[in-house]
Amino acid sequence: MAAPAGPVAAQTSLSRLPSLTGMRFVAAFMVLVCHIGIVLVPSVQKPWLNWTEPYVYALGPTGVVFFFVLSGFVLTWSARPGDTSRLFWRRRLVKIYPNHLVTLGAAVVLMLITNHAVTASNTVPTLFLVQSWIPDQEVVLNYTSNAPTWSLACELLFYLAFPVLLPLLRKIRVERLWLWLGAVALLICTLPFIALLLPDEPVMTNTDVPWWPLWFTYYFPVSRMLEFMLGMLTAQIVLSGRWIGLPLVPAMLLAGASFVVTAGFVPEMYSQASAIAFFLALLIAAGATADVRGRSSFFRKRAMMFLGEISFALYMVHWLVILYGPMQMARAGGWSGHSTVSQALLEASLTVVITLLLAWLLYRLVERPAVGRWSRPAMRGGSSLAADVRAGPAAEVHGER
């Protein structure tokens, strides 16, 4: 793969990005809160909570957009001279597949224990992380299994394409990088309009949202690859010295404002593929440059770093805790129950605590040992280059998560 190029490459290419590690937890926690909220907010049935619904529901999609943009940014940032496609793909698979296999195995066991059907459609595509390519709700969503792994199917496409995209990215003239960034951001915004050409029926289960347009804009890996490319372009802008110097706090305010606008005032189909990706790219670049230049960043605090390290594991276990933990959403009628405010808060709190504990265990017992042992082929004498893998920021991303 090509080495970083540009006037600031020597300064930035080997720098760790702890702020982005901390941001990963925020994004993963947004997904967790979203999935808790889509159940508990309606179950409480309090009119004064109704205004929160669009914002709670938008937290998860926004977190996923962040992860996809972040993947493109960090992989481009940390691309090493002399790296091969085979080694790159090996590192990425070792990063995601051990956690995936363990959590999918746990999901199958829990489905059997609770008398939920285990079928080829809700397990085999998920096992091979191809479910997002199949526009079938039972395959993509499979609610009683580990449904959020649909995003890993998108990540696999990103990883497959990255060794091809990176040399093309390096060929773009630096003065045109912002033009390309704007073009990709605009293309993301056009996806819902392209989706209008797709059938309005069927609708997504328990909603009035047309399934085909939703699948195309939200689940289809090719559509989501635009966000990955946005992250790649953003990293190249920073590496080439073309960053506008936006500080971290203003970037956070811009991202927050874009979330409020898209979640509160834009129809769901459009808000899930919107300009928020552009503002999240600015936030990621601002966090990276804050680290490189030694500027203050809340996301570099030790607690945030720890939580960021376990964020991928958190993402992988949280849905199973929601289904089979205190909220018991996998039981019959679990999605249509009623709850008091105090009961909902208790169930939500227990779900968060259990998720964090299981995420830490999965990280310590599965993810970290697997990365340390298998990310690189063994050297002569039985040692490995895993320490080198851990030293690079590419080992610090969601899904890289």
What feature does the model see in each segment?
Residues M1-Q11, M304, W319-R401:
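C-terminal "closing" transmembrane helix and its immediate cytosolic amphipathic cap
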Residues S15-R80, Y97-T103, S121, P125-P135, ...:
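Functionally critical transmembrane alpha-helices in membrane proteins and complexes, commonly lining
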Residues P18-T21, G60, V124, F128-A153, ...:
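Aromatic-enriched alpha-helical transmembrane segments of multi-pass intramembrane proteins
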Residues R24, L59-V65, W77-M111, T119-P125, ...:
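Transmembrane alpha-helical segments and their boundary/interface "anchor" motifs
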Residues M30-V31, N99-T114, W180-L191, A273, ...:
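Hydrophobic alpha-helical membrane-insertion segments
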Residues T76-G82, M111-I113, V164-R173, T234-R242, ...:
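Structural signal for the C-terminal ends of transmembrane alpha-helices
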Residues T103, A107, L187-L191, L280, ...:
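Alpha-helical transmembrane segments of multipass membrane proteins
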Residues D291-M305:
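Alpha-helical transmembrane segments
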